[in-house]
Swiss-Prot record:
NDH-1 is composed of 13 different subunits. Subunits NuoA, H, J, K, L, M, N constitute the membrane sector of the complex. Belongs to the complex I subunit 4L family. Pfam families: Oxidored_q2 (PF00420). This is NADH-quinone oxidoreductase subunit K. InterPro entries: NADH_UbQ_OxRdtase_chain4L/K, NUOK/Mnh_C1-like.
Length: 100
């Protein structure tokens, strides 16, 4: 069995990588991918903590987090497709400019 500290350190590293990608990248698709990495890091922390204490709650939270991530990804990708069709770019700086 993997020790609790190793699993939580891995989850923290993944979360920080996702947060860095979310803050640094200006492309909305990469920001969505970084958000997915952050959700998976939190789900990994639930799994590790649940297996350490022998409780199934971590696995239940993992299923909830994965279903939430799937819904978020499908809605996000649909919005990105519509945005790309209208503006022909996914750069957040050009999208945030107002027309008028």
């Amino acid at each position: 069995m993997i020790p609790l500290q190793h699993g939580l350190i891995l989850a923290a590293i993944l979360f920080v990588l996702g947060l860095t990608g979310l803050l640094v990248r200006r492309n909305l698709l990469f920001m969505l991918i970084s958000l997915e990495v952050m959700i998976n890091a939190a789900a990994l922390a639930f799994i590790v903590a649940g297996s350490y204490w022998g409780q199934p709650d971590g696995q239940v939270m993992y299923i909830l987090a994965i279903s939430l991530a799937a819904a978020e990804a499908s809605i996000g990708l649909a919005l990105l497709l519509q945005l790309y069709r209208r503006r022909h770019t996914l750069n957040i700086d050009t999208v945030s400019e107002m027309r008028g």
